[in-house]
Amino acid sequence: GLGDVYKRQGGNMQYISKYTSPLGAITLASNGEALTGLWFDGQKYFGANLSKEYKNVELPVFKQTKEWLNLYFNGQKPDFIPLLALQASEFRLAVWQILLEIPYGQTLSYGDISAVLAKQKGLKTMSAQAVGGAVGHNPISIIIPCHRVVGSNGNLTGYAGGLEKKIALLQLEGADMGALFTPKKGTAL
């Protein structure tokens, strides 16, 4: 539930830490108590909410996040989520909350997510493109699993971290790749 996603206004000071994953370098960001960002270095929208000033300090939340990532990259499903602080529109937060609920090793389409949102809001339909924009701007990769979102027909559409990483993450989770395919022309939302 939304209780898992804490919206806390941290101080203005931001902190970063680095993590080396089998898929490349990852940067973690925090407001001092909660995780505010997790990006593959060089990915689209990298550090979108990072201020110019930050300190490289090994905070408790970074230790916890790295423990989560160690378990994850060892093919295990972590049974906890570090404290997250997300600042975004209500719409984006609602989309990211649905992402948190996609089970490990499974996928949902943009259409599935828009149907869930429409139902939540009592609407007939909801734009899958708007959902795509929210998914693409997810600031906490892997933990908020935007890599589990696919196109309506199993098309492995864009992933801010790159399609190779998306495929590698899904394979790591043992997802059924049989019904999924890579678009001829890679598109990232």
Pin down the residues of each PLM region.
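Nucleic acid-binding interface residues in structured DNA/RNA-binding domains
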Residues: 15-25, 67, 76-189
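Short, small-residue-biased leader/transition segments that mark boundaries at the very start
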Residues: 1-6
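Short loop segments at secondary-structure junctions
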Residues: 9, 32-33, 43, 173-175
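Compact structured core domains
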Residues: 30-81
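Short hotspots in intrinsically disordered terminal tails
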Residues: 9-10, 186
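DNA-contacting interfaces and partner/effector-binding or oligomerization modules
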Residues: 10-36
